[in-house]
Regions:
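Amphipathic protein-protein interaction modules
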Residues: 62-115
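Alpha-helical segments in soluble extracytoplasmic regions
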Residues: 37-76
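Short, flexible domain-boundary/linker segments around small modular repeats
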Residues: 1-17, 75-87, 130, 138
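Leu/Val/Ala/Ile-rich N-terminal alpha-helices, chiefly Sec-type signal peptides and the beginnings
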Residues: 1-42
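Residue-level recognition of alpha-helical structural elements
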Residues: 41-45, 91, 114-122
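Generic structural concept
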Residues: 21-28, 32, 53-56, 60, ...
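Preference for long, well-ordered alpha-helical segments
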Residues: 98-141
Length: 141
């Protein structure tokens, strides 16, 4: 199972505000990692990857400022997984799905957040996630 699918599963299973924030932060971080792997090569998704990068970074940074985001766990360095390198089209599809799920979960978390700062982070994070999804599906600005 590749990292994108692992994070997507964690995001699907997240229910508490802290779980959603943690999984959404990791989702944005994984989006940025995926973009880094494909940004140097020409291809049909090159422009979308370049355009979606700032939105993913903005989402990660916004979620990172949420008061209810727990401190990161220190498990030590992760060993790289051996996975087949997906095509840029497969990456775009996986990132679009992850971004759509993040947007939905963050919208749900925003309604349950007690703190205005948490609510704002969830709403802004959902907007950034939707922007990433739009770029990856070709429906962006």
């Amino acid at each position: 199972m590749n990292p994108t699918h692992v994070i997507q599963q964690r995001l699907e299973e997240a229910w508490s505000l802290a779980e959603v924030l943690t999984a959404a932060y990791d989702a944005f971080d994984e989006m940025l990692s995926a973009f880094d792997r494909y940004q140097n090569g020409p291809g049909p998704f090159y422009a979308a990857l370049i355009m979606a990068g700032p939105a993913a970074a903005g989402g990660r940074n916004t979620i990172g400022m949420a008061p209810s985001l727990p401190p990161p766990e220190r498990d030590g360095p992760r060993s790289p997984e051996q996975v087949d390198e997906p095509s840029a089209q497969e990456v775009a599809g996986a990132v679009a799905g992850l971004a759509a799920l993040a947007a939905r979960k963050l919208c749900m978390a925003a309604t349950a957040a007690n703190s205005p700062a948490d609510r704002s982070a969830c709403v802004s994070g959902a907007q950034y996630a939707d922007e990433v999804r739009a770029f990856m599906t070709g429906t962006g600005p």
